[in-house]
Amino acid sequence: MEISGRRMRRFRMRFRRDHLTGGENIENEASCCYCDLKISNFNEPIFRLGRRFSGVLKVWFSIGLGFGVASLILVTVFLLLQFHSNPLFSNRLTSAVFGFSPSTRVSLSGIAYVLVSTVITVSVHELGHALAAASEGIQMEYIAVFIAAIFPGGLVAFDNDVLQSLPSFNALRIYCAGIWHNAVFCALCVFALFLLPVMLSPFYKHGESLTVVDVPSVSPLFGYLSPGDVIVSLDGIQVHKPSEWLELAAILDKENSKTSNGSLYLGGSRRFHHGKGYCVPISLIEEGYKGKMVENQFVCPGDLTAFRTMPCSNAAIREVSVCLDAKDIVKLQKCGDGWVTTSDTDNQSDCVCPQGDLCLQAMQSPGVLWTEITYKRTSSQDCSRLGLDFNTSNCLGTFVFVGDLIAMSHSVHLTAYQPRWLFNFFGKSFPNILERSLTCTFHVSLALVLLNSLPVYYLDGESILESSLQSFTWLSPRKKKKALQVCLVGGSLLSFLAFFRIFLLGLPLSRRW
């Protein structure tokens, strides 16, 4: 498409229109499918900045040129990998790049993070184009933000005649500048995430315990945990980071689904075994409700939980089935080999209880896991000052979760940052907001790199590919044009099929964002 006029660079689309005359005012456009806001206040400052540091910027954007061409090749390979025969592979690849799975449910707050991140990353992208053009002596005509149908975007407008007069190498520096700036911005986000614990260390502890940021009303933990609570352990295993929380939940769920009596190595000297029991006094058992057998299942009334004798080797088992209050039982001494141990002890001693007690375990159905969650209330100043000295604190609590552990672990929002007691009454969510903002900005910026590297029409990839083909001097103009058309048609078709597969057909659910 060759029309005299200026070229507009944008991360979504590119148009060329008639050249502006010197006294013509820039007017905003609005229609049923497109509207924009044009801004020309930054023309002179950006142009002066680009001309002042022209030499340095040309070196900087020459590096970006190499990155842009390499990105075009790598993104094409990524595009082809989307048609990998293994759906799980494609799903993980998409999640790694975009930060979410196609079937992921995005919350309202997540949408807000995406919108803010989009504004920031598009600004960085267009600033790259504007500075690169200024270093070549080309002043932009205006900056614009727009919405085309439902897709937001941004652009900078240049005089197309001046762009066409540039050597292909110089033009490539301008075309690759946007994705180069987005790539550098991704690196800055990663660096900021890495330094975040150090920067926030005067005000927040990091990696000691998990702090609850939010418990949605649909979460099974709603009513048990509150924002600001500190999760100490899951089934007796101390957790320090959200990733450890999810990993441990997956390990416990996997172990529960196994039918053998083997043990699972958790790292270090910790091992997980089968059979979680409690030493229950015989007097409490005799006072308990006996329950009823309904369709070969032991049923208890109300909120009572069914318990039975733990099967132990070399032990004189007294068969007992009784209904007890789980809130009272979890406070008792533990027995059985289903708890975390520091060594491989003799299984014969796992069921040993004090005289007058029996080792009982809760009856569980397949797919339902009995899990203890230990937490600390931090709503009072006294609890906050006690820190991790849980043994002397009456702020420590334990409750039992019975159900789908994987769904439960994803239903609550956690952070590894714990406010120091002076900041416990405000700013609890601040580290989480920073962390999510940086993470979301990283993924959006990376997505812009990939989108604008695609060999498709109306994106930066088209201009990069077109200028790159100009370097092949042995090809005639006709062959260059033909090669460009073949690459763009093929790239556009592959991109459409890939995104249709990713976002419309969907793939297996990965996680909640």
UniProtKB/Swiss-Prot annotation:
Residues 82-107, 159-182, 459-485 are lumenal. Expressed in the vasculature of roots, cotyledons and leaves. Disruption phenotype: Short root and increased root branching. Mutant plants have increased sensitivity to salt-induced osmotic stress and tunicamycin. Its EC number is 3.4.24.-. The lineage of its organism: Eukaryota, Viridiplantae, Streptophyta, Embryophyta, Tracheophyta. Its main location: Golgi. This is Membrane-bound transcription factor site-2 protease homolog. The active site is at E126. It comes from Arabidopsis thaliana (Mouse-ear cress). Metalloprotease that catalyzes the second step (site-2 cleavage) in the proteolytic activation of various factors, after site-1 cleavage. Part of a regulated intramembrane proteolysis (RIP) cascade. After ER stress, cleaves BZIP17 and BZIP28 proteins which function as stress sensors and transducers in ER stress signaling pathway. The N-terminal bZIP component is translocated to the nucleus, where it activates the expression and production of ER chaperones, as well as proteins involved in brassinosteroid (BR) signaling, which is required for stress acclimation and growth. The chain crosses the membrane at residues 61-81, 108-128, 138-158, 183-203, 438-458, 486-506. It comes from the Eukaryota. GO terms for cellular component: Golgi membrane. The keyword Mitochondrion does not apply. It is found in: Golgi apparatus membrane. The keyword Repressor does not apply. GO terms for biological process: cellular hyperosmotic salinity response; proteolysis; regulation of brassinosteroid mediated signaling pathway; regulation of response to endoplasmic reticulum stress; response to salt stress. Coiled coil: none annotated. It is a multi-pass membrane protein. The gene is S2P.
